[in-house]
Regions:
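Charge-rich, solvent-exposed alpha-helical interaction surfaces
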Residues: 30, 34, 38, 62, ...
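Short, solvent-exposed loop/turn segments at secondary-structure junctions
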Residues: 120-124, 140, 161, 182-185
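Pan-zinc metallopeptidase signature
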Residues: 43, 197-275
């Protein structure tokens, strides 16, 4: 994982994301009034910048040069450099736990990522293309680890295949179990299994027994995990699926979609889902 401040990426986002200060708004308005054609052409640069930032050369650099020479840009750049170091410190401090998220929970090869760091005032996490994310979000002083959750949610969501609207809720719920619940629990040292999207809480409770099996938790350990996470179910009414621990996250999502009639049930009838 590389955290990078790139002038072209930074300027592009200052130009085309919401203005977070009056000074930036006025500068953008002046550029638009004076160099409208060049401004429009600059919009097309986004993907080119993210795909090859080191070798990117704009077709027309008028807009970029004006901002680079602006007296306030150096100050903005220093703020972003400082923010980048703050994010990197958080990432490096929790690197081992994050690596285990991918090796032990996701179990699927994920490409290397470059995180293009921009002004935190822009309030964005934008998955631009495979291997590239634009990050500009305030680090919550009360919950600084949340930014790691958001980065990894963005990466994983965009590296798991797409599903139809009805089945996509399983994808969202299971990725939340992986990141917002299990990964967050490891980061914080206490259970975070009651966190996440309110609309998915019910589905995640149905998935929870199978999630424990996917995690390789033995049936004898279920009770201690239920106590830890404050989620209960009747252990004896679930057939233990040994094959789940051999799957990756995408395969587990497929399994849950395929067997949803057994997983979501009003009465916990012991049945054997198809693997």
């Amino acid at each position: 994982m590389k955290f990078l401040v790139n002038d072209y990426a930074l300027i592009w986002n200052l130009l085309f994301q919401a203005s977070f200060s009056e000074g930036i708004y006025k500068l953008k308005q002046k550029l638009w009034d004076t160099y409208r054609n060049e401004y429009n052409e600059t919009f097309k640069d986004k993907d080119l910048i993210m795909q090859d930032p080191k070798n990117f050369i704009p077709n027309n650099d008028i807009i970029y040069n004006i901002i680079l020479e602006n007296k306030n840009y150096e100050k903005l750049r220093k703020q972003v450099d400082k923010y980048r170091l703050e994010v990197m410190r958080l990432w490096d401090k929790n690197k081992k736990i994050t690596e285990e998220l991918y090796s032990k929970i996701i179990r699927k090869e994920i490409p290397d990522y470059t995180i293009f760091v921009v002004n935190k005032e822009l309030n964005i996490i934008d998955h631009v293309c495979q291997g590239s994310i634009v990050l500009g979000k305030e680090i919550d002083k009360k919950a600084p680890l949340n930014i790691l959750l958001e980065i990894n949610m963005s990466i994983i969501i965009n590296n798991i295949k797409k599903y139809n609207i009805e089945d996509n809720k399983f994808k969202k719920a299971i990725i939340e179990l992986a990141v917002l619940n299990e990964y967050a629990t490891s980061l914080c040292g206490k259970s975070c299994y009651l966190s996440g999207t309110p609309d998915l809480i019910g589905l995640k409770r149905w998935l929870y027994p199978y999630w424990l099996m996917y995690m390789g938790i033995s049936k004898e350990q279920f009770l201690s995990y239920m106590m830890r996470d404050q989620i209960s179910f009747d252990v004896e009414k679930y057939a233990y699926e040994k094959e789940l621990r051999k799957m990756n996250l995408e395969e587990f999502i497929d399994f849950c979609i395929r067997n949803q009639k057994y997983i979501i049930r009003d009465k916990n009838i012991k049945k054997n889902p198809e693997t």
